[in-house]
Amino acid sequence: MIVLQTIAVAFAMFSAIPVPQFDWNEKNMRYAMCAFPLIGAVIGAAWCVCGVLPLPGLAKAAGFALIPVWITGGIHLDGYADTCDALSSYGDREKKLEILKDPHCGAFAVIRLCSYFLAYFALCTCVSFTPRVGVLWVLALVLERALSGLAVASFPMAKNTGLAHTFATAADKTAVRRVLAVLAAVLCVGMAALGGWALVLAALAVLWHYHAVSQKQFGGITGDLAGWFLQKAELWMLAALCACQWGGLL
């Protein structure tokens, strides 16, 4: 029962998929970050279904771009937008953290979101779907969430409130780090074996950038920054996927 509740907590928080309602507590939140990557598997499965449907190229690309938003409910895009606003303010650390808490969407957030979707859609039009590509992208979506959860359990927090702090405080950090580190390592090996080493490098590069920016600009990570990382990792891995196909590696 605890295992199912733990999975339900992850899906309730990080997806728009309906799950049974129950009280969240220390037990069912302890390993919720370990279940977070499962959402990537669901998105990847839906992505593969879209890939095999007999749709026109542009319609298929639109499906590829919209599936992650539909399944997650846009929670990570919200963090991406808020973080873009904060970084574009060029204010001090306290000012940036205040902007992250502001529920309004600023001009820079709108510009970055439009640019993000345009780039994502353009890359999706370049994807030539094959079973190998489908499996590789499923692994990529799981990997980015494993790295995100690993960061929440490992990186310093910027503040003592918020989503990331709540899950980090409730988590058995040692166990979560071990599980997600092993999972991430296995995924990296699997992706490289499929010819997706460029996707692995892209994800790890964005993770390094995430750590550097969060420490320098915010003094640690927040839930918004976690969403910013996930969206950037996804975009750059998608670009790497297209590059691999264009280069004849897939």
What are the roles of these predicted feature ranges?
Residues 1-24:
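Membrane-proximal soluble regions of multi-pass membrane proteins
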Residues 9-12, 26-51, 165-169:
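N-terminal beta-alpha supersecondary unit
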Residues 18-24, 75, 95, 149-159, ...:
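C-terminal ends of transmembrane helices
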Residues 29-47, 86-132, 136-137, 174-190, ...:
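Multi-pass membrane catalytic core of lipid/isoprenoid biosynthesis enzymes
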Residues 34-83, 135-139, 196-216:
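Membrane-embedded alpha-helical segments that form the functional core of polytopic membrane enzymes
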Residues 46-54, 67, 71, 124-127, ...:
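Alpha-helical membrane-inserting segments
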Residues 67-105, 214-233:
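Acidic (Asp/Glu-rich) catalytic motifs at the cytosolic membrane interface
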Residues 146-180, 217-222:
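Solvent-exposed interhelical
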